[in-house]
């Protein structure tokens, strides 16, 4: 049974013993945000860096600024969107996407660490990350950008205070600290919710769809553990007015789980899915079809890539 207060005290002590001057990689998800807040309690020099990769949702940067301010986090926000998106050009393989993003993250952090004089990199890696990335004797299911995307030789000492926690435990500690509860968001961001090549046009489509899914899902009394749209490289025939269309397809993923290691597709109120579909096809002209993913984990992973 996890004791949040003890875990926080132990983590602060661990950080103080292992980090003299460090840089913390904050993706904006629950894991790295929790680590940023815990690290701010340590009596050591830590700079929390949030990178605008260009692969974020519409309100991510605003939310992070508010958390940095509310919890006195020594934070910095860097705009590196052009760099990330340019490196993903013509890349369609999901593993390659993750590794490119991971390597680019490390490059940016090493540069910032050098400027800051840091010798350590703190990351919000948790147990499912290194298990799925082939930790121990397990096969790699998929590389997580903060595990499988790391270069073999890195100029920073890696420190991972949360690596033995599971998702439900992260949420428990976050609640104890009064952090706003947010659904999990992958480190590689929207890049792995676009099947195929990532482009600015596709990112803009997916951001609009994400806003709709998150707003309509907020009306549910019992929200799924995770809920998001995926942009598919599939065009289908449709009708708009009396005109034929040949538009793109959005898949909706609602998943229920306790720890992120296994889960089942959610069965939300049908009217919510109907509203999501109607709004997406009405408000996003590039989309003319919405489908619902009814696959559990396993055999599928939560994210499509």
From Swiss-Prot:
Catalytic function, reaction form: XMP + L-glutamine + ATP + H2O = GMP + L-glutamate + AMP + diphosphate + 2 H(+)
UniProt keyword annotation of Hydrolase present: no
Chain residues that bind ATP: 27-33
UniProt EC number: 6.3.5.2
GO cellular component, one term: cytosol
Keyword tags: ATP-binding, GMP biosynthesis, Ligase, Nucleotide-binding, Purine biosynthesis
Keyword field contains Ligase: yes
Domain GMPS ATP-PPase span(s) in chain numbering: 1-186
InterPro entries from the UniProt entry: GMP_synth_C, GMP_synthase_B, GMPS_ATP_PPase_dom, Rossmann-like_a/b/a_fold
A molecular function GO annotation: GMP synthase activity
Pfam family, any one: GMP_synt_C
Pathway: Purine metabolism; GMP biosynthesis; GMP from XMP (L-Gln route): step 1/1
CDD domains in UniProt: GMP_synthase_C
PANTHER family on file: GMP SYNTHASE [GLUTAMINE-HYDROLYZING] (PTHR11922:SF2), GMP SYNTHASE-RELATED (PTHR11922)
Subunit-level organization: Heterodimer composed of a glutamine amidotransferase subunit (A) and a GMP-binding subunit (B).
Functional note: Catalyzes the synthesis of GMP from XMP.
Protein's name in the database: GMP synthase [glutamine-hydrolyzing] subunit B
Gene: guaAB
């Amino acid at each position: 049974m996890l004791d949040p207060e003890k875990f926080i005290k132990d983590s602060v002590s661990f950080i103080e013993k292992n980090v003299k001057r460090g840089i913390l990689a904050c993706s904006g998800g629950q894991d790295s945000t929790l680590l940023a807040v815990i690290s701010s309690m340590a009596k050591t020099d830590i700079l929390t860096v949030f990178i605008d990769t260009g692969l974020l949702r519409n309100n991510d940067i605003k939310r992070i600024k508010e958390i940095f301010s509310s919890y006195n986090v020594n934070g910095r926000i860097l705009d590196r969107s052009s760099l990330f998106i340019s490196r993903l050009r013509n890349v369609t393989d999901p593993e390659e996407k993750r590794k490119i993003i991971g390597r680019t993250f490390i490059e940016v952090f090493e540069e910032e660490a050098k400027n800051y004089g840091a010798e350590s990199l703190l990351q919000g890696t948790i147990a499912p990350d290194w298990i799925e990335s082939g930790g121990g004797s397990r096969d790699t299911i998929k590389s997580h950008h903060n595990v499988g995307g790391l270069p073999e030789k890195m100029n920073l000492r890696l420190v991972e205070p949360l690596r033995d926690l599971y998702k439900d435990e992260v949420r428990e500690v976050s609640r104890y600290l009064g952090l706003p509860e947010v659904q999990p968001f992958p480190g590689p961001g929207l890049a792995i919710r676009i099947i195929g090549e990532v482009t600015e046009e596709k990112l803009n489509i997916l951001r609009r769809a994400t806003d709709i899914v998150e707003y309509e899902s907020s009306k549910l009394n019992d929200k799924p553990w995770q809920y998001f749209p995926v942009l598919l490289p599939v065009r289908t025939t449709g009708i708009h007015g009396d005109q034929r269309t040949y538009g793109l397809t959005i898949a909706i993923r609602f998943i229920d789980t306790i720890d992120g290691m296994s889960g089942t597709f959610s069965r939300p109120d049908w009217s919510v899915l109907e509203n999501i579909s109607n709004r997406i096809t009405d408000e996003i002209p590039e989309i003319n079809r919405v489908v619902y993913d009814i696959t559990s984990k396993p055999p599928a992973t939560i994210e499509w890539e």
